[in-house]
Amino acid sequence: SSDVCSSDLGILSLWLGIMKIGENSGMINALSRWLSPVFCRLFPEIPQGHPAMGSIFMNLSANMLGLDNAATPMGLKAMKELQELNPKKDTATNPMIMFLVMNTSGLILIPVSIMMYRSQMGAAQPTDIFIPTLITTAISTIVGVTAVSIAQRINLLNKPILILIGCISLFFSGLIYLFTQVSREEMGVYSTLVANIILFTIILLFILWGLWKKINVYDAFIEGAKEGFTTAIRIVPYLVAFLVGIAVFRTSGAMDIIVNGIGYIVGLSGADTEFVGALPTALMKSLSGSGANGLMIDTMKQYGADSFVGRMSCVARGASDTTFYILAVYFGSVGITKTRNAVTCGLIADFSGIIAAIIISYIFFF
């Protein structure tokens, strides 16, 4: 846990420093005003043009691009801004719950790390899980957002949301088409290159915008970095408790009991039980990203990277994000102890991702 905390300290200090430059220069406010027509439908309790809109957008964009190191600090910045609007400081608000479920559903465009692991394990086509994973994580996100919208009585059938869904669908279609036109080696190189270029561009753009607005960029960065240090210290107790809980769960044998129980029940119905071998990865991903990666690699070692179980474990790993880790860190950063229905909605997204991973894997690989 000390390694995780020390790693988070540097990352949070860097990115909250960059975000403070954007805040002081007015860039976040400008981004918030631009996003208001869409985000005010999903987050109706956030005032139009509030800085939280910009931070939420930056976080979700970083998540979709697989820029985890940038996404978490931006998400914690958004949580701090949402907490400023919170009349009950120990209770999660509706916008917080919607934001966290959008994070836990783990929508990502290109699962670069999963494809890298498949390549290392000797898969003939490491990228063959791309389209199934993209479909699965999209389903998880849609179900999660829908669950929160039903709980909060948000109407999703309005023009801005439908236009956004249409644009995302077109983008996904274009991405899938481009994906089919390049080799797996080129895809890995291009994905990493694009991610690094975007990361560098974001940092450079914030600094240049601050210089253009004639603010003291250095002082703004230092101020934000100090906030990052304070935030990292604040989340340590929550993070340690969470990591201890995961260790107990993994070593107690509870995972084996759950997986074997599911396999037994499915077997009684006469249905195919081959998917059960990938369930440890699917269940662990809600708790720990590194734990899920380890189980995914173990599954590929045991069954083979190109086996049905090996491929499904990869699809399941990319279906959603580490729900309990995200809830612990994000809520812990602002002192939220009453999470309301955040865990329930997050687990609904997780469960839908697991079901989708099973069905889609059977369609593509069985």
Give the ranges of each region predicted by the language model.
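Hydrophobic alpha-helical transmembrane segments of multi-pass integral membrane proteins
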Residues: 35-75, 240-258, 263-299
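C-terminal transmembrane helix pair
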Residues: 71, 78-118, 123-153, 279-366
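Hydrophobic mid-bilayer segments of alpha-helices in multi-pass membrane transport proteins
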Residues: 8-15, 163-171, 193-209, 236-244
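Hydrophobic, small-residue-rich membrane helices and short re-entrant helix-turn-helix hairpins
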Residues: 213-232, 339-340
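Juxtamembrane interface elements at the cytosolic ends of transmembrane helices
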Residues: 27-31, 142-151, 200-221
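Juxtamembrane transmembrane-helix boundary signature
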Residues: 13-37, 245
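Membrane-interface helix termini and inter-helical loops of multi-pass transporters
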Residues: 1, 119-123, 180-190, 219-220, ...
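Short, small-residue-biased leader/transition segments that mark boundaries at the very start
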Residues: 4-6
